[in-house]
Amino acid sequence: MPVACSLSTIALYASTDKKAAADLNADTVMLTIYKNNSATSMTCSATATTTLHQVVSNTCTSSPVSFNAGDTLGMEWTHSNASFTLYTQYGAGLRCQ
């Protein structure tokens, strides 16, 4: 981080873009924030429906993380559906001020 800030908000979305007929389960995408290569308790998740291109969003504000100048911020993305035929698009915006 170039300057000190408090990461207070994650705005996350997920959307199913491609699936096979056998893909009946939704996919939950979760983002975990890392500070200096260590996981923090700040997470955010959204569960994409099985309807193609239906966007599901979530805004998370619990467990803010304070960063000092020189700290590193990392993101770990995980998802619940391991199907090789299900494609979930996801993304997030972060507010650190």
Where would I find each of the regions flagged by the language model?
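Extracellular and analogous surface-interaction loops
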Residues: M1-L7, S62-S66
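Short, conserved, surface-exposed binding loops centered on an aromatic residue
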Residues: M1-V3, D23, Q97
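A short beta-strand element within beta-rich, extracytoplasmic domains
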Residues: C5-A22
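Aromatic- and Gly/Pro-enriched, solvent-exposed loop/edge beta-strand patches characteristic
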Residues: D27-Q97
